[in-house]
Regions:
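Vicinal oxygen chelate
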Residues: 1-20, 26-34, 80-107, 109-193
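Generic detection of intrinsically disordered/low-complexity segments and helix-coil linkers/edges
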Residues: 4, 22, 26, 36-37, ...
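Conserved short beta-strand elements that form part of the metal-binding/catalytic scaffold
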Residues: 6-7, 15, 50-87, 93, ...
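Residue-level detector of functional hotspots within protein domains
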Residues: 12-17, 22, 35, 64-66, ...
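Core segments of cupin and vicinal oxygen chelate
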Residues: 20-24, 30-74, 191-192
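Residue-level signal for secondary-structure boundary sites
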Residues: 75, 97-99, 145
């Protein structure tokens, strides 16, 4: 177990039983919610999911809620956002190398990358399908990290360079998270807003 700058512990999560798979499949959905807190309670009370993280309207990304039915295995399976532009479908790959290969496939196919982020819990990139629906492809880091969180990265860097960025993030004293919504620093780090 490792502690973040607030003294909270990171715990390892199960990443994937077969790390050789290019595309594991659909892993979570990010959906628009008028009131993420209220909708999260519905999914908790009716569907039995656990609320694993959230932010309120004061966060630069707006109000959000993250839920999982298996929080030890998946950091979240549903993400709810008050900002409709953050709605997406997320597909998991089995390794950082696979993420980089998939990234090159998308770029090589002439599809514009919208975002490249380190979320703490994952490395990810985003693009749109032909009808404008946002798609996320990600590789989970195996760490728990407060969400929402997005730090711009460059997926053309080597795996070693990207892992150094992850290591630097976990030791950073002034990170951006749901409990530290430093708007200026968030915007400086190329937020999704």
């Amino acid at each position: 177990m490792t502690a973040n700058p607030r003294g909270e512990s990171f715990t390892e999560t199960t990443v994937c039983e077969n790390d050789n798979l290019e595309m594991i499949g659909l892993c979570h959905v990010g959906m628009y919610a008028k009131n993420p807190a209220s909708l999260a309670e519905f999914y908790r009370d009716v569907m039995g999911m656990q609320i694993v993280d959230r932010s309120d309207v004061s966060h630069p990304a707006g109000a959000s809620a993250f839920l999982s039915s298996r929080p030890r295995e998946e950091s979240h399976q549903i993400a709810m956002f008050s900002n409709p532009e953050l709605a997406h479908r997320a597909f998991k790959v089995g390794s950082l190398a696979a993420l980089k290969r998939f990234y090159q496939k998308i770029v090589g196919g002439g599809i514009r990358i919208k975002f490249e982020f380190l979320h703490g819990v994952s490395f990810a990139f985003y693009f749109e399908d032909p009808e404008g629906n946002m798609i996320e492809v990600f590789w989970p880091t195996g760490l728990k990290y407060p969400q929402p969180f997005a730090q711009k990265i460059d997926l053309t860097k080597t795996e070693e360079e990207l892992m150094k960025e992850l290591k630097a993030l976990t030791g950073q004293k002034d990170f951006i998270s749901r409990t530290n919504p430093n708007k200026a620093l968030w915007e400086k780090s190329q937020s999704v807003l």
